[in-house]
Amino acid sequence: MSLLPNCFIEYFLPIQTPGDGNCMWHMVSRSLCGNCSLTNLLKDMTVITFFMLEQKFIEIMTIDIRANNKDANEIQLREQATQRFHRAVQVAKTPGEWGDEYHLLALTTFLATKISIYNFYHPNFSKNELLSSFRRAGERQIW
């Protein structure tokens, strides 16, 4: 049924979305209205949010790039961040392209709400049980 490790299946309920590369937007749509009908609108809103907050996103991307590239000067960092920003916009505009944390941040900003879409806790387990189980699984290196 799933390619997830058993330690995930034990604690999470898999939720199926179309396998077209838009899974993040599909999941947000499902959480808003119960189906994937808002997917394209959410992708459009992601693009609009990027453009409305372009300088802020470039600033965030610059910080991310700087963390991994200590030797780059500010001009290089800004150029790389601008390229990354334009790529993020292109991804949001293109059907079937996978979103990332920048797209999730844009959606969170637009919707003015916290988004937790990567998992859905199994109703029989508390969050503390879940976290301690993952900690134990990580110690056993079963990932």
Describe each model-derived feature in a short phrase.
Residues 1-129:
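Papain-like cysteine protease catalytic cores
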Residues 127-143:
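Active-site signature of cysteine proteases
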